[in-house]
């Protein structure tokens, strides 16, 4: 069992928290807003377009910018699994024009509450993330003897100089963890919490 710290309590952070809890880890979610998943409430004009009822391949064909970025994610968790997850959490779904999937209730809040249920078992702490806590790695040991023929010497690729061991909160408190996952979103909607904290980290 690992101590997992997830920075950001939006849709991605709550999904990650639920998955980590199910793998038996101790999970803490750091969320700087009063209410986790707040941006979910404004998606799909307040209805939340959960996914599209299509294959992963069809989905990727409609991604205009850098679809390759989503290959592994959609390969592991295609739209059908997303629908299955929410239906398993008690959300009744419907498919509308353009194969868009919405909750029958037409309320994004239902999706937010479902994700909170999925993340049950994780501790949600209301604090922001100010900095990553880094621990220097010991330098790699040099080989005992250099090869006689310099043509056979392979240039070493530089590795990471440090590893992340936690986060310093805006409150001044430090949160230590074995694994740190940054799921802060971008700068799309600052009033809902998307304030670019991940970029600054």
Which residues fall in each region the model found?
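Predominantly flavin-linked oxidoreductase catalytic cores and closely associated redox partners
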Residues: 110, 114-201
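Conserved Rossmann-like nucleotide-cofactor binding loop
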Residues: 12, 35, 130
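Glycine-rich active-site loop/strand segments that organize a redox cofactor
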Residues: 47-95
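Short beta-strand to alpha-helix junction loop
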Residues: 70-80, 97-117, 189-197
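Short phosphate-binding/catalytic loops that engage adenosine nucleotides
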Residues: 25, 91, 122
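Glycine-rich FAD pyrophosphate-binding loop
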Residues: 21-45
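Short beta-strands and strand-loop turn motifs
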Residues: 93-98, 181-184
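N-terminal Rossmann-like FAD-binding beta1-loop-alpha1 element of flavoenzymes
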Residues: 2-29
